[in-house]
């Protein structure tokens, strides 16, 4: 199976706070799956690092385009952490555009990137890479157990185990979430996945073994899928 793995900023926040054990466990899990024949394309989110730097730059009067550039640079720093952890299994640099990503992927190494274009989330980057590579599955490792019918901190919030693209769009339109807290999935990424009918499994990033469970099709997190599947 070819998998696009989006490692959300939450994971790198944990690494910054707690040390390298979590990212090391991610590498073990990815390489274990790789030995079983699964291919990985990896995208790193920005997390608190990006939010902090964007906040400082905003207070200094930086333009939105500069804020976008700062966010991209922070995701690339996190990508370098993942590359360092993967060692010689990884392509040595995070590609900065899709053409370079595809060329790097053909090297047979595990390619890790951050953001690509201003105004585009790493969700959208992962979705486009999934489309370019004809990935069988996109997995998003995030700070929640999956998609809920409302904010997960609200009383009575229920995890949705399976949801169609259209239902996901409805939830996005009905609920608003503060940036950097609970993140469902970027609507642009959702549209990209829908047009290519690529399923996305959204799971909690606290346990790297969730990657294997998602690949195996186990009932974990939330599966976002097309009506034709």
Q: Residue locations for each model-derived region?
A:
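C-terminal catalytic "cap/lid" subdomain
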Residues: 1-229
């Amino acid at each position: 199976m070819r998998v696009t793995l989006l490692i959300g900023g939450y994971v790198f926040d944990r690494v910054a706070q707690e040390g390298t054990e979590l990212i090391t466990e991610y590498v073990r899990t990815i390489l274990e799956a790789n030995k079983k024949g699964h291919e990985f394309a990896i995208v790193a989110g920005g997390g608190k690092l990006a939010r902090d730097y964007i906040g400082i730059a905003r207070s200094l009067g930086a333009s939105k385009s500069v804020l976008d550039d700062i966010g991209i640079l922070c995701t690339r720093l996190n990508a370098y952490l993942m590359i360092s952890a993967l060692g010689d299994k990884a392509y040595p640099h995070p590609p900065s555009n899709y053409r370079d990503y595809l060329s790097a992927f053909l090297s047979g190494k595990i390619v890790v990137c951050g953001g690509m274009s201003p105004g585009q989330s790493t969700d959208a980057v992962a979705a486009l890479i999934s489309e370019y590579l004809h990935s069988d599955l996109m997995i998003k490792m995030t700070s929640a157990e999956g998609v809920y019918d409302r904010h997960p901190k609200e009383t009575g919030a229920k995890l949705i185990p399976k949801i169609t693209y259209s239902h996901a769009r409805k939830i996005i339109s009905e609920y608003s979430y503060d940036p950097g807290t609970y993140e469902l999935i970027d609507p642009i990424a959702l549209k990209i996945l829908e047009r290519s009918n690529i399923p996305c499994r959204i799971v909690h990033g606290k346990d790297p073994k969730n990657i294997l469970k998602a690949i195996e099709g186990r009932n974990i997190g939330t599966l976002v899928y097309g009506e034709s599947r």
